[in-house]
Design a protein with these regions (language model features):
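Acidic, Ser/Thr/Pro-rich low-complexity intrinsically disordered segments
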Residues: 57-118, 125-128, 135-136, 197-198, ...
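Solvent-exposed serine/threonine-rich low-complexity stretches and specific carbohydrate-binding patches
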Residues: 99-112, 164-169, 217-219, 226-242
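Beta-sandwich interaction modules
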Residues: 109-125, 236-253
Length: 293
């Protein structure tokens, strides 16, 4: 199978996948050369997820430029399809003045029907302009090259529930101290949990448990070891806790978590079946641009 047929097959597979997950459909334009400088760049327009254009780099042309805009806080990656015959093909991200930001020659999914190159792009302000430059590399100057450019969201979300080992024991507040008494500490190590994407950051976190005997005036208390600070649950509950933690705190999910609880009752108690519920966000740049489900 020659490279043109493989390219068409690869595009067909990508389009089928895009159709199954698609938002509103749009015609995918084809750009057949002439866009070899930033001033002649093909304008893709504003970023939307999975926005694509098909590119043809004609014989005798060495590069192809595309222009697009992103808004503040949008984090995307530009995906450029590849063929094994395209030796030293590269893709570059450039700023609005055509200065190089990053460049990639690394072929991802090289053994599949849809190998690609990727560069990351982070929007800092609304309507920010970037250029993508596709370079021929060592491929025969007398032959055309076929590829696709796709703009994709990098930030995705997930969630999971994980169980602490053991029981937390509270000796009881026999002195009736106003501040109550903290229990023993139990731990949960998520450092190597394969269900959690690399680089995942906590978006929301909560705990569930069973206290025996059930008491009032109980607060769950949680500590991510990388932070080293204890977070006390927002409200009193013997069975659950939610915390003032968000993605702005930039707390990694994959680490050791510690748990204890505070009780004001005078009698001894234990807390069992302690579970950590985590919602997270993650960047596909940390997972070779693959979703973790």
């Amino acid at each position: 199978m020659n490279f043109k047929k493989k390219f068409i097959l690869g595009i067909f597979i990508c389009l089928c996948a895009a159709f199954l997950t698609a938002k509103p459909a749009y015609a995918i334009p084809t750009v057949n050369g002439g866009n070899y400088t930033s001033s002649t760049a093909y304008d893709i327009g504003g970023y939307t997820d999975h926005k694509s254009v098909t590119g043809i780099l004609p014989a005798q042309e060495i590069c192809s430029y595309f222009k697009f805009t992103v808004n503040a806080d949008e984090k995307i990656y530009v995906r450029c399809s590849h063929d094994k015959s395209y030796s030293n093909m590269s893709v570059e991200l450039r700023d609005s003045a055509d200065y190089l930001i990053s460049k990639s020659t690394r072929v991802l999914d090289a053994s599949t029907l849809t190998p690609f190159l990727a560069v990351n792009c982070d929007g800092k302000k609304n309507g920010q302009t970037f250029y993508v430059k596709v370079n021929r590399g060592d491929y025969d100057i007398n032959k055309p090259m076929y590829f696709s450019i796709t703009l994709n969201n990098r930030i995705h979300s997930g969630s999971g529930t994980f169980s602490f080992t053991g029981s937390a024991v509270n000796r009881g507040n026999s002195s009736m101290a106003y501040s109550g008494v903290d229990s023993s500490i139990i731990k949960l190590n998520l450092s190597r949990e394969s269900k959690i994407p690399a680089g995942a950051i906590v978006k929301r976190v909560s705990t569930k448990s069973t206290q025996s005997p059930s008491q009032g005036n109980v607060h769950h208390i949680l500590m991510p070891e990388s932070v080293g600070n204890w977070y006390t649950s927002k409200v009193s509950s013997a069975t659950s806790g939610s915390y003032y933690i968000s993605e702005k705190d930039n707390i990694p999910v994959k680490q050791v978590w510690q748990f204890k609880y505070n009780a004001k009752a005078s009698k001894r108690s234990t807390m069992n079946n302690v579970k950590l519920n985590v919602d997270w966000i993650y960047d596909l740049a940390n997972t070779n641009y693959k979703r973790v489900l």
